[in-house]
Amino acid sequence: MTVIRGATTIAEDQPEEIKKAVGELLEQIEYRNQLKRDEILSIVFSSTSDIHSFYPAKAAREAGFASCSLFSAQEPEIDGGLALCIRVMIF
């Protein structure tokens, strides 16, 4: 099994920003790693605590990643941590 990680940031916590960023991130990961969607078992997202307007996993589902399990979680608040960040791990 191959596991691929990635991350992106958004300019502001708005549903459209999250949808756009997640869609672009997953498209780039697919392209750069020559992934096929039917090979993906699961996608796990984490986001910083300043993102609360939309689930990244729901954005992935709406972007066409509906045949694998999807999960979103919130990262712990870390002093000096990157703001408005969405991270992903693809199995």
Regions picked out by a protein language model, each given a short descriptive name:
Residues M1-F91:
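Terminal domain-initiation and capping elements
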